[in-house]
From Swiss-Prot:
Coiled coil: none annotated. This is Pyridoxal 5'-phosphate synthase subunit PdxS. Belongs to the PdxS/SNZ family. Pathway: Cofactor biosynthesis; pyridoxal 5'-phosphate biosynthesis. D-glyceraldehyde 3-phosphate binds at R164. Keywords: Lyase, Pyridoxal phosphate, Schiff base.
Length: 295
């Protein structure tokens, strides 16, 4: 197998910085996302809110669905695989997608291992709730991290929690000695070289987007102000009353996240946002964010 270089994979991820990646389930939605200014689309059969409602086992999208969406747009297309399901990843690579999301939104396939992402030519994005989780995924070859949030809820609280957790951990290690960093590496179960690099850079070594519960332009701007390099929006666009308007507004708010006047303007008369779920109504064992966090 010919391996894509680490530089090329991370370079692709950096090209999406400052942008919005939108979940789409068909060619029509993909075209709406592209017209709104999305930097990429995520091809899947059901958005996270529908996956949550349906229950059962959620798997990689049918290849015909992925191809339909790839043929509909000129922007990069991503697709999800189950955690640890390297054959689903092989299939998506064969189809020619631009990036693979090893995602907790789908049912976990392997409770002991994530995919060895260095065995693939295309880049991967993975979710994380804390610094240790993020750096373990980077060590496996992830070219992008996204804070997990709680997908399919329309509730940004967990996305905020995870971004603050990661950013806070980075601030704590920035001025530590090398010996102290080794201790941190042991405590968070992460490679010490990556812990040291994170302390030196003042950020995790790859692009870090936010995901899970972003439903409004203000949500997107909030995550950017908290330190995200960009945002994933799953159910928030196409479960809203006016997807075309919301998609454009989220893109504008993400690009101009410090301009309150602009955010107010694009947030006006959008219609109803997607229905939300109080995180306290979701039992701990049913929270998607918990999938893969112990690996």
């Amino acid at each position: 197998m010919i391996h894509g270089t680490k530089v090329l994979k991370e370079g692709f991820a950096k090209m999406t910085k400052g942008g919005v990646i939108m979940d789409v389930v068909n060619a029509e939605q993909a075209a709406i996302a592209e017209d709104a200014g999305a930097v990429s689309v995520m091809a899947l059969e059901r958005v996270p809110s529908d996956i949550r409602k349906a229950g059962g086992v959620a798997r990689m999208a049918d290849p015909s669905k992925v191809i339909e969406i790839m043929d509909a747009v000129d922007i990069p297309v991503m697709a999800k695989v189950r955690i640890g399901h390297f054959v689903e990843a092989q299939v998506l690579q064969s189809l020619g997608v631009d990036m693979i999301d090893e995602s907790e939104v789908l049912t976990q396939a392997d409770e002991d291992f994530h995919i060895d992402k260095e065995q693939f030519t295309i880049p991967f994005v993975c979710g994380a709730r804390d610094l240790g989780e993020a750096l373990r995924r980077v060590d496996e070859g992830a070219a992008m991290i996204r804070t997990k949030g709680e997908a399919g809820t329309g509730n940004v609280v967990e996305a905020v929690r995870h971004m603050r957790t990661i950013q806070g951990a980075i601030r704590e290690i920035e001025n530590k000695t090398e010996e102290e960093l080794w201790q941190v590496a042991r405590e968070i179960n992460a490679p010490r070289e990556l812990v040291k690099l994170t302390a030196e850079k003042g950020r995790i070594p790859v692009v870090n987007f936010s995901a899970g519960g972003i439903a409004t332009p203000a949500d997107a701007a909030l995550m950017m102000q908290l330190g995200a390099d960009g945002v994933f929006v799953g159910s928030g666009i196409f479960k809203s009353e006016n997807p075309e308007l919301v998609a454009k507004a989220v893109v504008e708010a993400t690009a101009h996240y410090e301009d309150a006047d602009l955010i107010a303007d694009v947030s006006t008369d959008l219609g109803a946002a997607m229905p939300g779920i109080d995180i306290n109504e979701i039992p701990e064992e049913e929270r998607l964010q918990n999938r893969g966090n112990l690996i």
